[in-house]
């Protein structure tokens, strides 16, 4: 079961943050114009109705990342890898990549690909949600793949809905906007099973980047249920790096390390799950420094962040590259639909990472339990999120 509200609330809040050119989400005065006309900067491409190449090797694919670096060993990089794999499978040119200096450049970078009449524009992360929605609204004849942006919340006119009424049908209004979403509670559940099994103290922790992040909430909700499945008496401590600053939440490993170290000292946990992007790399560093196990997020962080591989027992994975490359193939084949493109265990869209150097520390019984749980997820018989899925009030304070 998925809850639409919090995942989309973060897009609405991000829209206000970006429009104000601030990471604090401040100032109703600066946010009001964006609420009235959120897509003022998005324009249609020139040259009439866009036509797609009949030769699949001629398709032009571009990638617009989130703030940070393309080789961030995380969301941007794996999204880009998926686009490159999709292009390679077609025999098309390697996609060019643009990286914003800050959130104010997100829309401009996407518009750049529109102006060059690209066929498929891939955008990374929920922070790109409003800009991608706007570009897709202005250019309904160009394909957009928005990673971690589904399901889209739009007005009856197909514009981003910062009032969060979601009265529009995105699939109809934005027919070529493929907004990828993931069932975060499923990999979170698997990570929770690992945490509860590996814990000796019976106390485990989870740190999310920002309270506004619906996917972060679902990750930790699944983590809680998975841990309780293994040990009903497990103690879970949860904290959040920030309530308003997206840069600090997801792109500040120094803050992450300091925050993680204090969290470990205060709560005496011996397994720590990070759900904070690049900030979480610092949290994993803190786990290693404290001599406890860390659990990564989104990608296999034992590989993507080798600095912490010695203590990263597993990661709760979204198959980012697979979802992007698959959607590119489906678009060119003519089978892809717009709207929410949901990836879960049934589509092999989630999973847990190998144990790598810590393989010998993991009981064989846990490996079998994880395989069984994943099989139940694929069959749709395992509940991995509470009834209020996506509701932060269900988590420990």
Locate each region found by the language model.
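C-terminal motif of bacterial Sec signal peptides marking the signal peptidase cleavage site
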Residues: 17-20
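A residue-level marker of the well-folded mature domains of exported/periplasmic proteins
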Residues: 23, 29-397
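N-terminal export and membrane-targeting signals
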Residues: 1-12
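N-terminal targeting and processing segments of secreted/endomembrane and organelle-targeted proteins
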Residues: 3, 23-24
